[in-house]
Amino acid sequence: MAGSRPGKSQVRLTCVSRCATVSRSLDEPVSGTAATATTWLLLEQPGPWGAKALTSSHLDRALGRALEAAADGTGVRIALIRRPGRHADPGGPADRQVYAAHTVPGRVWLHRATIRDPRRLLGLDFAALGAGDHRSFGAALGGRPHRGDPLALVCTNGKRDRCCALLGRPLAAELSASGVRGVWEVTHLGGHRFSPTVLVLPYGYSYGRAGAHTIKEALDGAQEGRVVVEGCRGCSAWDRPGQAAELAVRSVAGEYRAGLLSVVRTDGAAPRWEVTVGHADGRRWRVSVAQSASQPPRPESCGAAVLGTPARMDVVAVRELRPTALAS
């Protein structure tokens, strides 16, 4: 009608809207949206971070480029971390924490090292780390198994997306102030529009639109070997169809123990996949996953020049396979 006021959704869906606000208002599903990595390599780097933090922080730029090249195609994802609220860079030699975490179920591990010279990371065997072999982490960095609490990595990099700073930094501060140990700020987890986003290690499950209560529950669950599915984006060990399929099986089967479900096979290609999820006890499920474009168009990140229709993963069906069907 001429002269009528635009609807609430019309006002929100502009390129200047905060991407997380719009995504939440449209109830965009978070399942099947996690960043993919079989292994995470996390380097403590105080001070400010740029949008591409490995080459736009106080870390030596040439070293950042070399680390990116070394990790390319190996399944290792590198990110910088810092303590909540501690953004000053004192300069000079200082001990840095380094973590490596392999997230493939059945072979999960989390190791930690303390170093002064980050160039030592170039001595790592990235291909082996991506495949789950942690020996070079011990040999090059003196790393050992992490014996402390699970880690909560909160994306706070406002140079990457303002929602990460506006929503992530308060969450990291709240968790830290409440006595939760193992909380770090991290440079990038993908999916800015799901801020605050959090990665929980060692099991590698990411969470979107995360509140302090959910993350505390997820950390308690990780400590007990249990996966919290509320707000879960998926396990980084799997691709996006696999992430959605695994979470669907957890809900259908009521199986929340970590490490017992694996994506054993994926057939098909976009926009439709048949994903086989296996249990350690021998059970199997076939999950139909369909990709579609999210509607209406919305900002996929803050400051995006155009509105987008991000892909979403919808679970169409979950079917438990009987022994006679396993060979098909």
Model feature map: region roles:
Residues 2-328:
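Histidine/cysteine-enriched polar flanking segments
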